[in-house]
Amino acid sequence: MYLINQNGWIEVICGSMFSGKSEELIRRVRRTQFAKQHAIVFKPCIDNRYSEEDVVSHNGLKVKAVPVSASKDIFEHITEELDVIAIDEVQFFDGDIVEVVQVLANRGYRVIVAGLDQDFRGLPFGQVPQLMAIAEHVTKLQAVCSVCGSPASRTQRLIDGDPAAFDDPIILVGASESYEPRCRHCHAVPANKDK
């Protein structure tokens, strides 16, 4: 039996908000730089919480990033000398992101994506479940529940301190002022704001 060492694979980092997804993506990108590999980082234009041209973790770590509006815009920035392509907040990209990631991995790039696997309602979010299914490596991170201290796998959206209703808009970019990590048992999603 022969071991064939081929380049090109997909890594998914997922979990709730405040679980360390961006921090882990930044850590992996920095490690590639120590190995003298060339990396590029992308983020969706919609993510402008801390910076327009950096991926920034909640604890302040950051790495330069190229903001893009559409998934296929990523191809415009890909060059042959690159080894690693990292994409943060992947849940905010359009449906083409799955194909883009597949094409890049098939071309021999190590592709690292990070994003929320569930929306604030606790349902699968965007294209992340599909990316998890096709990835060679999946890392699911957990935060700490802000209510009871248990491992948190959910993201609680708060509006004026109260849980957001099930029918509220799915995408609302924010940080600690509008979201907090919760465990399954402390996570709440009222069916109607009036109830």
From Swiss-Prot:
GO terms for biological process: DNA biosynthetic process; thymidine metabolic process. Zn(2+) binds at residues 145, 148, 183, 186. It catalyses: thymidine + ATP = dTMP + ADP + H(+). ATP binds at residues 15-22, 88-91. It is found in: Cytoplasm. GO terms for molecular function: ATP binding; thymidine kinase activity; zinc ion binding. The active site is at 89 (proton acceptor). Keywords: ATP-binding, Cytoplasm, DNA synthesis, Kinase, Metal-binding, Nucleotide-binding, Transferase, Zinc. It comes from the Bacteria. Its EC number is 2.7.1.21. One of its GO terms (cellular component) is cytosol. Belongs to the thymidine kinase family. Homotetramer. NCBIfam families: PRK04296.1-1. PANTHER family: THYMIDINE KINASE (PTHR11441), THYMIDINE KINASE, CYTOSOLIC (PTHR11441:SF0). This is Thymidine kinase. The gene is tdk.
